[in-house]
């Protein structure tokens, strides 16, 4: 492990495998290499600056507490701020946007902050246990997060297991119904469908047209990384995250979204778990025998 400017870089036999980044607005994983050394992730593309490798977020998070601090402005619109939210809000509501923060042009802004990281190195791989806080732009705490990211090098694929627990602090918190929420992967530009890549799910359905909004046990995204090589990333939700629709796009992002159709209220101390295994492999989905 090498630590450099809030990056925890993982190597196996001298080969760079992945890095866990603290980030300015949220923690994320980037880069992530296949055994042959091809990076399968993209960070902050021009079309969506908030798509940072592998990360977690939610567009509509609100604290359900009665009191004067929740008085909201009657101003409306995406560009406005609310007194309680203290930062960019979701289309004029009192919910805080923890999804698109990196794309906002004005501050102060909400942030997902790493408070501590414990590292464990074993034969299985390297695990990072992080205590994380979701705070709005006025530093109100909305969610406590406990995240474990385990990086394992392999001959057929390099593996990242990311499991996170989102917990309400001393008051109930609502995670509203949202299109933009969940556990996100943004694939490397050359892998996306628009540049010759391909999305395949467990049922054999292909690309955005056939896979978007469907429930599937796994999704693979692969494409050309050089003139002669193909690489990709497979995502396998953990049992607690299985059964939710996939957001798959031909231009590069895919994510698991438990809040696509229904909101969720977490009572004080109550937690919700979301997670997945990510496999960076060489070759196509079929070549890698996903």
Residue ranges and their predicted role:
Residues 1-71, 75, 163:
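Beta-strand-rich N-terminal accessory domains
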Residues 15, 117-125, 153-156, 224-230, ...:
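A short, structured loop/turn motif at beta-sheet edges
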Residues 17-34, 147, 153-196:
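Acidic (Asp/Glu-rich), glycine- and aromatic
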Residues 55-156:
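Extended, loop-rich substrate-binding clefts of extracytoplasmic carbohydrate-active enzymes
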Residues 132-134, 166, 278:
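Hydrophobic beta-strand positions in extracellular immunoglobulin-like domains
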Residues 172-241:
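Active-site/ligand-binding surface loops and adjacent short beta/alpha elements
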Residues 233-290:
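Beta-strand-rich recognition/accessory modules
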């Amino acid at each position: 492990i090498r630590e450099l400017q809030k990056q925890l870089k993982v190597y196996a036999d001298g080969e760079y495998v992945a890095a866990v980044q603290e980030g300015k607005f949220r923690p994320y994983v980037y880069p992530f290499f296949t055994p042959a050394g091809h990076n399968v992730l993209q960070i902050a593309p021009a079309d969506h600056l908030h798509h940072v490798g592998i990360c977690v977020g939610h567009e509509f998070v609100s604290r359900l507490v009665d009191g004067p601090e929740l008085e909201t402005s009657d101003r409306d619109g995406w560009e406005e701020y609310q007194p309680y939210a203290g930062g960019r809000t979701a289309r004029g509501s009192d919910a805080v946007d923890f999804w698109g923060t990196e794309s906002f042009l004005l501050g102060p802004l909400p942030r997902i902050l790493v408070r501590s990281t414990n590292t464990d190195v074993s034969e299985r791989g390297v695990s990072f246990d992080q205590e994380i806080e979701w705070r709005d732009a006025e530093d109100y705490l909305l969610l406590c997060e406990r995240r474990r990211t385990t990086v394992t090098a392999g001959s057929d694929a390099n593996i990242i297991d990311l499991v996170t627990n989102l917990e309400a602090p001393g008051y109930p918190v609502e995670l509203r119904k949202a299109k933009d929420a969940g556990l996100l992967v943004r694939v490397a530009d050359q892998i996306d469908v628009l540049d010759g890549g391909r999305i395949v799910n467990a049922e054999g359905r292909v690309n955005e047209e056939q896979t978007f909004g469907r429930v599937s046990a796994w999704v693979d995204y692969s494409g050309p990384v050089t003139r002669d090589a193909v690489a990709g990333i497979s995502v396998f939700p953990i049992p607690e995250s299985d059964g939710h629709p996939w957001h798959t796009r031909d231009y590069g992002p895919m994510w698991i979204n438990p809040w696509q159709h229904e909101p969720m209220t977490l009572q004080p101390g109550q937690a919700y778990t979301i997670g997945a295994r990510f496999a960076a492999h060489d070759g196509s989905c079929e070549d890698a025998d996903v």
